[in-house]
């Protein structure tokens, strides 16, 4: 029986690469996107052509209601065996003093709150089955940082 994974931020970059690896291993993949619809649909078609079930699911993980709906839609493919949180955005390259409250909240909303909301939504599915894995991913910004002062 095939396994099922939900990958947030899966339309491009690290998320898309992660989706390709899971699909190559035979996993069915739910690809979350927020703005990159065409890229997500193209990736779903690419993965499906390789013999796995792949679906593109729109949702802003920084919104708890959308994160809940996203997990439920992904679970309709089959029991979720894994969640991989790749969704992330970054501040523009600017001085910290030029960063607006809105910019800061948006980044924290996606990069921090989004991880919490999707994990919280998927946990009941995994606890009920007494199995499942959650992986959180960061880009190199999480290691190298940047100068903003």
Language-model segments: which ranges?
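Conserved NAD(P)H cofactor-binding loop of Rossmann-fold oxidoreductase domains
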Residues: 86-92
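Conserved glycine-rich Rossmann-like NAD(P)H-binding loop of the short-chain dehydrogenase/reductase
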Residues: 25-42
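Conserved glycine-rich cofactor-binding loop
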Residues: 11-12
């Amino acid at each position: 029986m095939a396994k099922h994974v939900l990958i947030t931020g899966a339309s491009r970059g690290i998320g898309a690469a992660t989706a390709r690896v899971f699909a190559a291993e035979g996993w069915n993949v739910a690809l979350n996107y927020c703005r990159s619809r065409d890229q997500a649909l193209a990736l779903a078609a690419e993965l499906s052509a390789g013999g796995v079930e792949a679906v593109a699911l729109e949702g802003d993980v920084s919104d708890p209601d959308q994160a809940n709906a996203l997990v439920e839609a992904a679970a309709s493919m089959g029991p979720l065996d894994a969640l991989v949180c790749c969704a992330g955005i970054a501040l523009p390259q600017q001085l910290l003093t030029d960063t607006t409250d809105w910019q800061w909240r948006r980044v924290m909303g996606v990069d921090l709150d989004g991880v919490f909301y999707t994990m919280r939504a998927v946990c009941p599915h995994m606890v009920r089955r007494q199995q499942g894995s959650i992986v959180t991913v960061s880009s190199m910004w999480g290691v190298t940082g940047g100068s903003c002062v």
